[in-house]
């Protein structure tokens, strides 16, 4: 028999429900359902027990149209996400409903979004490098397969573009499965991402649909269901216009889908999965909104007192087990570019590699605007990467650090006061800085340049040639937005020829 209650109070997304008639309270984190007058189902999540018969819940949808006295049904379980091969290539919201205009996937399997982290004995500790084809990342802050990676940056420095390039590169290089959780970001970016994935073949809607899309149409009747099951990605969205409840839970919905692919279904081996979260700060921000609405005392800078607990509960689920792995890339918005803010600082503690995007580097026109001295990785050591890679990375860091120290002298006294050796360091460091830039596949329509994936061997060779002084004769501009060092040499020699009057 259903456990039925009634709404007693509505304050924005917070709804109080009384179960006085049934006398049975739903468990904490249970999903409750209310049906509006127009037939739409609103899902609530039980957060607090207020007394003998009352609970306080947070809504996963907007609450317009709800009134006191409406019937509320306890589902008896947490919010469920459909899983299985049928969710490949599909778009879902926080409660696992398809939002791509196609029918709900035919899968009997569902998993609760609140699940325990894997047991200690099941966790895998093997270390393997995940090469991305992006020079600055692969050389100085390499990613760990099955690790957690953070992309830190303020507004408008290129976090989402970098994430889209990583999805594109890794899907093509490793033919991996990706789950993308859009947490509190722009709806337009979600739309762009879906189109980008269809164009690149990461999501496969079939040839007929692709042709209609190229002609400017969006005819979902032309989607090939067989082709859809061969897609390499699943998308889950809770955008910035949605309720704080949805934004606080959508990352867990995406993670649940990734966990299913990682663990397998019991009959077959699990997979290596990529989980992209854009933006993990919005998860914290939504948690802060919910916490305040629930009446909890705020802690530092107004964040929720349970910030570290909520972050830890989610991050501990993102791990590699003996059956498969989840490698997560998380974009982290840094409020006012302050890395000591509690939200990014709490995220730092869980990461294996950090890629810091800098406004100062973006202002130089160097994209991706990765700060090579602020970014780090726990596997930057010779045992994992080998001596040649490690030594090259150290040489690059040393020359950039020395250049940074000399910048104050240059600003006050000018280049004339530097020693001959320091002048060489400055010019080589500037070439190194520019060689970190690279044209992206996903930015081809903005830059007009063909996207490049660069192997680690080509990257090491290029930076060694610059630091050894083999390319001192080439202009600095030759190293800007190129892939391999051969392209830089070709571009530089062409520039020199054009500069010499015939």
Curated annotation (Swiss-Prot):
Gene3D superfamilies: 2.40.10.170, Bovine Mitochondrial F1-atpase, Atp Synthase Beta Chain, Chain D, domain 3 (1.10.1140.10), P-loop containing nucleotide triphosphate hydrolases (3.40.50.300). Its main location: membrane. One of its GO terms (molecular function) is ATP hydrolysis activity. Its EC number is 7.1.2.2. The keyword Nucleotide-binding applies. It holds the Pfam family ATP-synt_ab_N. It catalyses: ATP + H2O + 4 H(+)(in) = ADP + phosphate + 5 H(+)(out). F-type ATPases have 2 components, CF(1) - the catalytic core - and CF(0) - the membrane proton channel. CF(1) has five subunits: alpha(3), beta(3), gamma(1), delta(1), epsilon(1). CF(0) has three main subunits: a(1), b(2) and c(9-12). The alpha and beta chains form an alternating ring which encloses part of the gamma chain. CF(1) is attached to CF(0) by a central stalk formed by the gamma and epsilon chains, while a peripheral stalk is formed by the delta and b chains. Produces ATP from ADP in the presence of a proton gradient across the membrane. The catalytic sites are hosted primarily by the beta subunits. This is ATP synthase subunit beta. The lineage of its organism: Bacteria, Pseudomonadati, Bacteroidota, Cytophagia, Cytophagales.
